Amino acid sequence: MPGIKVREGDAFDEAYRRFKKQTDRNLVVTECRARRFFESKTEKRKKQKISAKKEVLKRLYMLRRYESRL
Protein backbone atom coordinates (compact mmCIF):
# COMPACT_ATOMS: atom_id res chain seq x y z
CA MET A 1 0.00 0.00 0.00
CA PRO A 2 1.47 3.35 -0.98
CA GLY A 3 2.18 5.88 1.68
CA ILE A 4 4.39 8.91 2.03
CA LYS A 5 5.97 10.76 4.90
CA VAL A 6 5.21 14.45 4.80
CA ARG A 7 8.37 16.40 5.41
CA GLU A 8 8.45 19.56 7.43
CA GLY A 9 7.88 22.53 5.18
CA ASP A 10 6.26 20.41 2.44
CA ALA A 11 3.34 21.98 0.66
CA PHE A 12 0.14 19.95 0.36
CA ASP A 13 0.37 19.95 -3.43
CA GLU A 14 3.87 18.49 -3.31
CA ALA A 15 2.88 15.70 -0.92
CA TYR A 16 -0.26 14.94 -2.89
CA ARG A 17 1.72 14.73 -6.13
CA ARG A 18 4.19 12.26 -4.57
CA PHE A 19 1.32 10.15 -3.20
CA LYS A 20 -0.46 10.15 -6.56
CA LYS A 21 2.75 9.12 -8.31
CA GLN A 22 3.12 6.15 -5.94
CA THR A 23 -0.47 5.01 -6.47
CA ASP A 24 -0.01 5.23 -10.24
CA ARG A 25 3.17 3.16 -10.08
CA ASN A 26 1.52 0.49 -7.93
CA LEU A 27 -1.60 0.35 -10.13
CA VAL A 28 -3.87 0.73 -7.10
CA VAL A 29 -6.61 2.66 -8.88
CA THR A 30 -6.53 0.40 -11.93
CA GLU A 31 -6.84 -2.71 -9.80
CA CYS A 32 -9.73 -1.24 -7.81
CA ARG A 33 -11.60 -0.43 -10.99
CA ALA A 34 -10.99 -3.94 -12.32
CA ARG A 35 -12.27 -5.54 -9.11
CA ARG A 36 -15.30 -3.31 -8.87
CA PHE A 37 -17.49 -5.89 -10.62
CA PHE A 38 -17.08 -9.64 -10.68
CA GLU A 39 -15.41 -10.95 -13.80
CA SER A 40 -15.69 -14.63 -14.70
CA LYS A 41 -12.73 -16.67 -15.90
CA THR A 42 -14.07 -16.73 -19.46
CA GLU A 43 -14.32 -12.94 -19.51
CA LYS A 44 -10.76 -12.64 -18.21
CA ARG A 45 -9.46 -15.03 -20.88
CA LYS A 46 -11.40 -13.15 -23.55
CA LYS A 47 -9.85 -9.84 -22.46
CA GLN A 48 -6.39 -11.41 -22.40
CA LYS A 49 -6.84 -12.75 -25.94
CA ILE A 50 -8.00 -9.37 -27.18
CA SER A 51 -5.08 -7.56 -25.53
CA ALA A 52 -2.64 -10.14 -26.92
CA LYS A 53 -3.99 -9.59 -30.44
CA LYS A 54 -3.68 -5.83 -30.01
CA GLU A 55 -0.10 -6.21 -28.83
CA VAL A 56 0.81 -8.39 -31.82
CA LEU A 57 -0.78 -5.93 -34.23
CA LYS A 58 1.03 -3.04 -32.56
CA ARG A 59 4.39 -4.80 -32.82
CA LEU A 60 3.71 -5.71 -36.45
CA TYR A 61 2.83 -2.10 -37.22
CA MET A 62 6.01 -0.86 -35.54
CA LEU A 63 8.11 -3.45 -37.37
CA ARG A 64 6.66 -2.48 -40.75
CA ARG A 65 7.13 1.17 -39.94
CA TYR A 66 10.75 0.55 -39.02
CA GLU A 67 11.39 -1.53 -42.16
CA SER A 68 9.94 1.17 -44.41
CA ARG A 69 12.56 3.61 -43.11
CA LEU A 70 15.44 1.39 -44.16
Curated annotation (Swiss-Prot):
Disulfide feature: none
An annotated Gene Ontology molecular function: structural constituent of ribosome
Keyword check for Transcription regulation: no
Protein keywords: Ribonucleoprotein, Ribosomal protein
PROSITE patterns: RIBOSOMAL_S21
GO biological process: translation
Coiled-coil annotated spans: none
UniProt superkingdom: Bacteria
UniProt GO cellular component terms: ribonucleoprotein complex; ribosome
Membership in a protein family: Belongs to the bacterial ribosomal protein bS21 family.
NCBIfam families: S21p
Name under which the protein is recorded: Small ribosomal subunit protein bS21
Source species of the chain: Helicobacter pylori (strain J99 / ATCC 700824)
Designated gene of the protein: rpsU
